[in-house]
């Protein structure tokens, strides 16, 4: 059921919980407000995709367990949710994509996210979260996109034991992260790395295992030393931003005449295009056979 971009107002009706057979529900971009009805969280046990984005929903996010045992995609971004990230999300063991960004969530990032073993995309940017980033997030075998930008996260980036798992996109800009950038962070899978506007120090790590990185954004830190010459060997890079650091030495000759798409408007536009393309190509959940009685033949593009 697609009810997006209408003029619906008031609270979400409790009767939503009576739709036991529904698999797809998108009521984004309306003016619903208030909290999620308990009857809704306890019903709709056939839901596979639920989109509640861009509304005025408030109070806690999933403070208790729900019956959404089959859900693969949950989008609750751009609302007014407050409080801690609810433990009710812990029961969504089939979840592949979770977006709770652009809310007013506070507290720390729960360590139990690593129990969602099928999770490919976790987006919690633009909230009020604090504390350290749990090392368990970086070792998840399936997690490919992790977006924690624009919070108040602090501490060092962990020296992840397994080389940051399957991560391809890591967005940590506008936090209070400190310490050095671990060599293991630039693993063989990373495509986009955004660490802008933190308090990171030390040298830019070597790019020994990096093969596919397209975007490297390190602006606004306290990085020192020279620009690694090994950057010249990273042929895949599209965007490179090292401004507002404390770097010294000479610019490698391979970068002096490089065109990195930093013209007017090109920076943000290209970053958006590449990340959006990544989401569609690697993470999107697509329905096929929409006209058949079984709506929900799902395939994950990889």
UniProtKB/Swiss-Prot annotation:
Gene3D superfamilies associated with the record: Ribonuclease Inhibitor
Ribonucleoprotein as UniProt keyword: no
Species whose genome carries this gene: Arabidopsis thaliana
Family: Belongs to the RLP family.
Keyword match Iron: no
Pfam families: LRR_1 (PF00560), LRR_8 (PF13855)
Coiled-coil residue spans: none
Keywords attached to this entry: Leucine-rich repeat, Receptor, Repeat
Full protein name: Putative receptor-like protein 16
Extent of the LRR repeats: 1-19, 20-43, 45-70, 72-91, 92-115, 116-140, 142-164, 166-188, 190-211, 213-234, 235-258
Lineage of origin: Eukaryota, Viridiplantae, Streptophyta, Embryophyta, Tracheophyta
Stored InterPro entries: Leu-rich_rpt, LRR_dom_sf, RLP_Defense_Trigger
């Amino acid at each position: 059921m697609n009810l997006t971009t209408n003029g619906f107002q008031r609270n979400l009706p409790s009767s939503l919980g009576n739709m036991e057979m529904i698999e797809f529900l998108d009521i984004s971009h309306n003016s619903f407000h208030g909290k999620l009805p308990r009857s809704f969280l306890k019903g709709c046990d056939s839901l596979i995709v639920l989109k509640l984005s861009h509304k005025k929903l408030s109070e806690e996010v999933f403070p208790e367990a729900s019956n959404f045992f089959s859900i693969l995609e949950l989008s609750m971004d751009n609302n007014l949710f407050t409080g801690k990230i609810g433990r009710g999300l812990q029961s969504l063991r089939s979840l592949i994509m979770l977006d709770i960004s652009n809310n007013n969530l506070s507290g720390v990032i729960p360590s139990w996210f690593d129990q969602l073993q099928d999770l490919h995309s976790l987006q919690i940017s633009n909230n009020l979260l604090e504390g350290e980033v749990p090392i368990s997030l970086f070792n998840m075998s399936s997690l490919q996109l992790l977006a924690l930008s624009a919070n108040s996260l602090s501490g060092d980036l962990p020296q992840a034991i397994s080389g940051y798992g399957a991560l391809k996109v890591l967005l940590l800009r506008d936090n209070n992260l400190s310490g050095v950038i671990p060599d293991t962070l630039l693993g063989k899978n990373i495509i986009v790395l955004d660490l802008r506007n933190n308090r990171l120090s030390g040298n830019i790590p070597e790019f020994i295992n990096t093969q596919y990185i397209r975007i490297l954004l390190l602006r606004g830190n306290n990085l020192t030393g020279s620009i690694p010459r090994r950057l010249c060997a990273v042929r895949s890079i599209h965007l490179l931003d090292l401004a507002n650091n404390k770097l010294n030495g000479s610019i490698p000759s391979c970068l002096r005449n490089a065109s990195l798409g930093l013209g007017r408007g090109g920076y943000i536009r290209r970053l958006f295009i590449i990340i959006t393309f990544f989401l569609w190509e690697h993470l999107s959940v697509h329905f096929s056979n929409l006209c058949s009685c079984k709506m929900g033949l799902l395939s994950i593009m990889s």
